[in-house]
Amino acid sequence: MTNFNYLRVTKTKKIRYIKHVKKNTPYIVFLHGFMSDLEGKKPRAFLNFAKKNDLGFLALEYSGQGKSSGKFINGNISKWSKDTTLLIRKIVKKNKIIFIGSSMGAWISINQFKFFKKQIVGFLGIGSAPEFLEGLMWNKFSKK
């Protein structure tokens, strides 16, 4: 059974996450894909790997996804990246980071490089999709 936590960001915004706290050790930070959540096999597999290998772990559901508050349609890469930055600063702190991003989560991982470049010791992109908007949505946007 996985114990989920919530970080209250504002009176109306909370972010659901899983953590395995370890001091002075690298953290795996798993970031899920578009319209996904923490209920799947990947977050659990990486959490179990972290526990077996004496590593810290953090995974979160971006606002509007999973059981985090908010509406999905109000989210975007920038907002979800900010959710991620906030949780990393709160949970991982100054520990080293190994990012694992699944699909869109790889894109959000890459966005974190500018904030945590001195802490990053690894990055794994699984089915990375940094250009998925072009095929799915770009042609539907207005010229404005």
Give short role names for the model-derived ranges:
Residues M35-K41:
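Short substrate-entry loop that stabilizes the transition state in hydrolases
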Residues F99-G101, I126:
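Short beta-strand immediately N-terminal to the catalytic nucleophile in serine-hydrolase-like folds
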Residues M1-K23:
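N-terminal cap/lid segment of alpha/beta-hydrolase-fold proteins
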Residues K11, W107, Q119-K144:
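The alpha/beta-hydrolase serine catalytic core
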Residues P43, L47-S69:
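Conserved alpha/beta-hydrolase
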Residues Q65-I91:
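Catalytic nucleophile-loop/oxyanion-hole region of alpha/beta-hydrolase
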Residues G101-S109:
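Gly/Ala-rich beta-loop-alpha elbow adjacent to hydrolase catalytic centers
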Residues T25-G33:
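Short beta-strand element of the alpha/beta-hydrolase
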